[in-house]
Amino acid sequence: LKLAVFDICGTLYHDNTTYSFLRWLSKKNIIKYNKSIMNAPYILRALNVIYSSFSRKDVYRILQVKQLSDFSFDDINKWAREFVDELEENRIYSTNILMEEYKKQGYKIVIASATIEPVARAIAQKLGVEYYSSTIGFLNNKCTGEINKDLLFLKKDTLLHLLKKAETTIVVTDNYTDIELVLVSDHSHIIVRNDRDIEKWNRCLKANARKVDFIKKDA
C-alpha cells in the first residue's frame, strides 16, 4: 500500500472550511449571524489557539458548531454540497495538482481533516477520495450541535490501521497539529505562507526536516 494523506483547510483549500461553511449559511439566512461567535476579536481567537494546544479542545469551533442544532441530517449535507460547489475558486491549485500526481502513481489518497463531516464528505465526493473527519451528533435525524469526535489531535490514531499497512506514506498539510503524522511519514509536503513558517517547522522537525519540502501558499 502506498498512502498519501492530505489535510483540507489551508492545504487543499485556502479556507477554514467549517468556519466558511457557517458563514455561508449565515449569508443564506439559514443561521443567524452571531458576531461574537463568527467574528471574535483576534485576541480571543489567539487565546483559543493556545488553550486548545493544551486542552485539545477548540472552544471557538465548539461554539460555532452549536449553530447547527436542530437542522436535519439531509439538509446539512445538502447545504454542505452546495457550499463546496461554490468553494471551487478557493482551491489551492498546487496541492490539488499534487494529489492528481499521487493518484497517477498508484497511491491510495485519503483526506484527514478536523473539519466537520458534512463538509469533508462533500469535498471527498468531489475529489473521488476517502475521508476522515470530525463528526457531529445527530439524534432522531436532528443535529445536536455537538462535536462527537474531534479529529484535530487524533489524525495519527485514526489513520493507524492504514499507516501500519503502508509501505510508503506521504503527508501533505499546513497544520502544526499534524506534526505526529509528519514524523511517521516517509516524506511530507508542508504548505507555508512565508519564510517564518518554514523556520517554525524546521524548529519543530529538527533532524526530521530533511524529509520534508515546503510549498508556498500562493496558488
Enumerate the predicted regions with their spans.
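A short local loop/turn or secondary-structure capping micro-motif enriched for an aromatic residue
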Residues: 22-23, 140
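C-terminal cap/substrate-recognition subdomain and adjoining C-terminal extension
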Residues: 1-2, 78, 85-219
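Periplasmic-binding protein-like
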Residues: 21-22, 214
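Residue-level signal for pocket-adjacent positions within structured domains
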Residues: 7-8, 63, 131, 142
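Catalytic cores of large soluble enzymes that bind and process phosphate-bearing ligands
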Residues: 13, 68, 151
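A metal-dependent, Asp-based hydrolase signature
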Residues: 17-18, 26, 30-97
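Short, well-ordered alpha-helices that flank and scaffold nucleotide-derived cofactor binding pockets
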Residues: 23, 27, 125
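Asp-based phosphoryl-transfer active-site loop
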Residues: 1-20, 182
